[in-house]
Structures are given as structure tokens and as C-alpha cells.
Amino acid sequence: MNPSGSIGVLEQNGEEHLAAPILGPSVNSDNPQERIQARRLRIAARQEARRREALGEYLDGKKESEEEQSKSYKQKEESRLKLTKLLLCGTELVTNIQVAADIREIHRRVEEEETKRQRLEKLENEVKTSQDKFDEITSKWEEGRQKRIPQELWEMLNNQQVHCAGLVEDKNKLISELQQELKIKDDQYVKDLKKQSEDITVLLERMEEQVKSVMKNFRQELNYIEKAFESERQELLTTNKKKWERALQAHNAKELEYLINRMKRVEDYEKQLNRQRVWDCEEYNSIKIKLEQDVQILEQQLQQMKATYQLNQEKLEYNFQVLKKRDEESTVIKSQQKRKLNRLHDILNNLRTKYSKQIKQFQEDNQSLTSDYKRLVTQFKDLQKAIRHFIIIDQDKFREIWLMNEAEAKELAQRAFDVDKIIHSQHLGLPWKIPNFWFLNNVGPISLQQQQKSVTQILEELLLQSEDEGTETAMSEDESYMDLPNQVSAKTTKKILVLLCDESGFLIESKLLSLLLPLEKSECYLLRLDAIFSALGIESEDDLYKMVNFFLRFKAHHLSSAQVSISTHSNAERTSLVSALQHMSLMSQTDRRSSASKSDGDPTELEDQQGSDNGSLMGRELVEQEDLSSPMFIHPNDVLKILDAFVTGLKKPKDARPVQRLKKDTRNNLKDTEYWESLAMVIPFSKQNLWDALFKALEKYYLVLTQRAKLLMENDSLEQQNAEMQSLLQQYLQAKVNLELQVPPTQGFRMPSK
């Protein structure tokens, strides 16, 4: 700590400290802050020395680097050193007040410890002496009880009163001394507060002076640094300007040299072109001579071919004569075959009679089987109606039971949440947030998986419609065509299938056609389409939707291919139809995937996925919506052409994809299990453990409260007994017998107050 005289000099002559040498803090100083500062400066000096060694500088400052340091760098270093010294001096000047205050506080605490120790010793001595006096007084009470003469008893009481007064006087004297000491400490505390306020004012004044001096020196050094940078900038501008002029001169010389070299290269290229022309002329003459020789050789070969032609003509005449002889032999063989044919005709007539008999028998069997088939079909339809009815009833019952159990579970979960809220807010004092679980917002059973229908089921829904099932057929039609485009109706699809059935009869076996004759029209169409689709390889619902869309887009592709070229009409139409089929297969796959994931995905994501596939055809579908929906544009002669293109295009995507198997209309029990398990675990194990710990603590708290209640009851009973005893004592003291006594009992002790 610096003396007060040096502090005044530092306040008045702040700028002189920059030039005068400053004695740094010492490690051997008595001040701990000064020792800490000395260690920090020593560590900083070591780090600076390591940095200089890493940069290749020398510690003694005598040897610098090969390149001379710039003026700006020198000015920055000088300013940094000056400002560092100024800040160190200012910090020391400001912290002197704090150091002096700390020393005063240390001395005060030492004195306070000493006075406290003396006070405690004095109090202990006082306690011992007062205890001895009190013991002496209590021992004399026993002697007073043994005395029977009132005069001696009165003297003893006077002595006891004197001793008690002396004891009380000693206690009062001690209390007055402690109060006087407390008053002195209060005065000392007021003086310390005044001294601290004076130190704070001095500290603030010094800090303001230091801030002003530091600001002044910072501005001055900043001006010096700016001047150094400006002079260095001017020097750099002059040197760079000279370098730029030298670079321009070198660039001009290089450009001149480049022009000379370019002229030389142009002359060399002209010479090479002349040599190339001469070589091409010579090569042309040699090729011409070679081709003339080839022509002569070909003429010789032509003469040889004529000679061989003459020879072959003679051979053919000879063969003609041989064939004539063979024809005569064949006439003889024909007559023999005619006789054999007549014999076979007789056998054929016999077989026809047998065949007619068999046909009649088969027709009778067919009629009986057809009647049985119709009866079974009606029974099957009735069974389907009953199954649908029971499915709807079961679904309604399942939904009612689900909702009832779900409401009960959610009510229990809400009660658990209320209990958790009370525990958090009242017992734990923590904020409670309403949990947001996904299963709490669910109402009703989880949706069934979508079921993909087979081609036969769709054909039954389309063709086997009766007038008695008006509402049911409409519902089934809507369900079966849920994935078709919006512009395609069930009526249009039925017309396309009928047209396909009429024009593709060659794909059906003749035996099957003969068996289908006695059936009804709708059943006949159904079986014929089943055979056609099995021949074409159409097995799934997606393939049927592709074919319908393919037929509807045929006219647009037909017109576009006709405008391109008339000569290549068939090839262009075939390629356009195949490409359209491939594009539609991709569209149908994306549509099926999007419809299968509607219940799990986001509608916006589905639109984004379908947008990339359907974007190219969206404009044309909106314009041609009315044209595509009508099957009148499809000519019967074009049906086979469309089928050919569709089957060729269907082979590629069908080879790559796996065979889709029909799934039963089952529920996803895993989702149901997960849902009910989640409802059962609305309160996690961590909170349940917290509840168990809280329950144990509340049980302990209940035991403590019961014990306190018992103690309070005992206290009330004791108070009641005490009041009864006081009333009895009061009656005893107020009795008339006590007035006749020379020393009444009221003089020996005081009555307790209620």
C-alpha cells in the first residue's frame, strides 16, 4: 500500500507517471492483492516471451527481424505500453482506498474478537458468582423452615432480602455495563459509516479523474496512430504506383512479342494448307483409278451370271417334264381317295346321329345345372345381404362398446390428471401443465385397412346389378370406383367392358361359348370377361383401372399421332399408346399408394406426391373431361389395336411388381393394443413413484398430527386440573381461619396469576 503523500502526487501529476519509472508489485509484499498482481504480471511476461520466441523475435530487443517494422506498428506498440502503464497507475490509485478500508476492517475485527472474549469471560465469572450466591440463599431457606420462633424467622427473612437485593444489584450493574458498551458500538458504527461514505466519495473522485485522464490519453494516442497510418498509406501509394507502371511496361512488351509470334504461326498454317491441298488432289486421282478397275470387274461378273441363268433355265424345263408325270400319278391316287371318302361319309352320318342324341342329353343336364346354379346364386346373394347386415350391426355394437370403454378410460385418466394437478399445486408447489397425448383426442375405433378388390368382384358389382337392389348397388358402385378418375362413371365403364366383350370373342374357347348360350346376358358377359381378362393377364383392380383409362385416352392419342405423319401412322400410334400406358401405370401406382395411406398421411403431402405424376396431363384432362367420359369416340375396329398396345405396355410394369394378394377385412390389432396401452399409461412410472413417495411422507405427517392431537388433549386436561387446584387453593387462602394466625400463608408466597 502506497502512503498518502504519493497518492496526492499521482492525482496531481497523472501525465508524469508515463515518463517516470513505475515500481511493479512485489511477490514478497504483505498485501495479498499485490502478491496476486505480481504473479499475474510474471505469467503475462512469460507468455509474451514465448510468443516472441515463436515469432522469431529476441527478448533483449537488440536484434530485430530482417524487414524493418512499420511506423504504424511501432506507434501502436508505444501507445499500448503507455496506456497500459496509465491503466496500472490508475488501478493502483483507485484500489488504495479499498486496501486501506480492508486493513481497518481487519483491525476492527481483531479488536472485536478480543472484546468479545473478555465479555464472555466476564459473563462466565458473573454466572459463577451469582450461582454461588443463589445456592447460599436457597440453602438458608431450608434453615428458615426449621425455625419456629417468629423473631428469628423475621431476622432470617431480612438477611435473605438483603442477599437477594445484592444479587439483583450485581445483575443490574452488569446490564448497565453491557448497555454502555452497546452505545459505544453504535457510535463507532456511525463513525464507520461516515468514514466509508468519505472513502466512497474519494474513490468516485479518483475514478472520474482517471476516466478523464484515460480518455484524454486515448484520444491523443489515437491521433498519433492515425497520423502514422496516414503516412504509411502515402508511402504505400507511391510504391504501388511505381510497381503498377513497371507492370504495365512489362505487359506491353509481352503483347508485342505475342503479336510477332502470332504472325509467324499464321504463315506456317498457310504453308500447311497448301501442302494439304496437293495431297488431297493426288489421293482423289488414285481413288478414281481404283473405282474404274472395280467397274470392269463387276461387268465380268455380270457376264458370268447370264451364263448361269441360261443353265438354270434348262434345268427348270427338265423338272417341268418330271412334274407332269407325277401329276398323272396323282390323278390315279385321287380316284382312290374319293372311294375312301365316301366310306368315311357313311361313318360320319352315324356319328352325327349319336352326337345329336348326346346334345339332347347334355342340354337336359345343362338346364338342370343352370336351375341349380341360379338357385345357388340367389342363395349366395341372400347370404351376402345377411353378412353385410350382420357386419354393419357388429360394427355398430363394436363402436358403441369402444366408445363406452373409451369414455370410461378417459374419465379415469381425467381423474388421474386432477389428482396429479392437486399433488403438484398444493403439496409440491410446482406448476402443472396439461399433458397433450395423441390418443386423448381420438374418438371411436381406429379405421380399418383398405381392402383391394379383385377383378371378378368389380365385374360382379358392375354387371350383376338388379332392379331390386337399387340402393345397395349404388353404394357398392361408389365403393368399387373410389380410385377411378372423377370424370369416369360406372355407366361408361360398363359400356367399355361390353364393347370389349363383343370385339374380343376370339380369345374365348369355343366350348365355353357353347356353354354360355343358355345363360342370362349379365352372367354371360361376366364369364366372358373373366375368360378375356385371364387371357390378357389382367388380374388386379389396378390393371382394370389402367385399361379403362387407356381406352378413354385413346382418341386423344389417336388424333395427336395422326397430325405428326400419315406415312408412319401405325408405328407412331402404337408407340404413343405404349408410352401412355407406361405413364398411366405410374399414375395408378401413385394413386393406389396415396389412397392406401390416406388415413395415416397428411393431405398436403399426398397432393405433393401426386402433383409430380399428374402435372403433365392435368391441363388436358380438364379440357377433354367431357370427351373422355363418353365411349362413343372408341370405334369397334380400334378395340383390338388398343388391346394389343395395352398388353405390350402392361408386360413391363407387371414383371417388376409383386403379385398382390387379397387381404381379409381385418382390423389392425397392434394399433388397438397400442392405443389401449397408451390410455392405461397416462400416468408414467416416474410420477407413480413420486406418488408412492408422497403417500409415505403423508402417512408420516398423519402420524405426527395424531401425536400432536393427543398431546393437545393431554395439555387441555392438565390445564383443567391446574384450574381446579387453583380454585381449591383460593378457597383455602380466603378461609377465616387464616385471619386468626399471626403469620398468614399469604405473606410467605405470592398467589399465581391466572
UniProtKB/Swiss-Prot annotation:
GO terms for biological process: axonemal dynein complex assembly; axoneme assembly; cilium organization; cilium-dependent cell motility; determination of left/right symmetry; heart development; mucociliary clearance; protein-containing complex assembly. InterPro entries: DRC1/2_N, DRC1/DRC2, DRC1_C. It is found in: Cytoplasm, Cytoskeleton, Cilium axoneme; Cytoplasm, Cytoskeleton, Flagellum axoneme. GO terms for cellular component: axonemal dynein complex; axoneme; cilium; cytosol; extracellular region; sperm flagellum. It comes from the Eukaryota. Residues 1-32, 55-76, 587-616 are annotated as: Disordered. Its main location: cytoplasm. Keywords: Cell projection, Cilium, Coiled coil, Cytoplasm, Cytoskeleton, Flagellum. Pfam families: NYD-SP28, NYD-SP28_assoc. The keyword Cytoplasm applies. Residues 98-388, 704-743 form a coiled coil. Component of the nexin-dynein regulatory complex (N-DRC) a key regulator of ciliary/flagellar motility which maintains the alignment and integrity of the distal axoneme and regulates microtubule sliding in motile axonemes. Plays a critical role in the assembly of N-DRC and also stabilizes the assembly of multiple inner dynein arms and radial spokes. Coassembles with CCDC65/DRC2 to form a central scaffold needed for assembly of the N-DRC and its attachment to the outer doublet microtubules. Component of the nexin-dynein regulatory complex (N-DRC). Interacts with CCDC65/DRC2, DRC3, GAS8/DRC4 and TCTE1/DRC5. Belongs to the DRC1 family. This is Dynein regulatory complex protein 1. It comes from Rattus norvegicus. The lineage of its organism: Eukaryota, Metazoa, Chordata, Craniata, Vertebrata. The gene is Drc1.
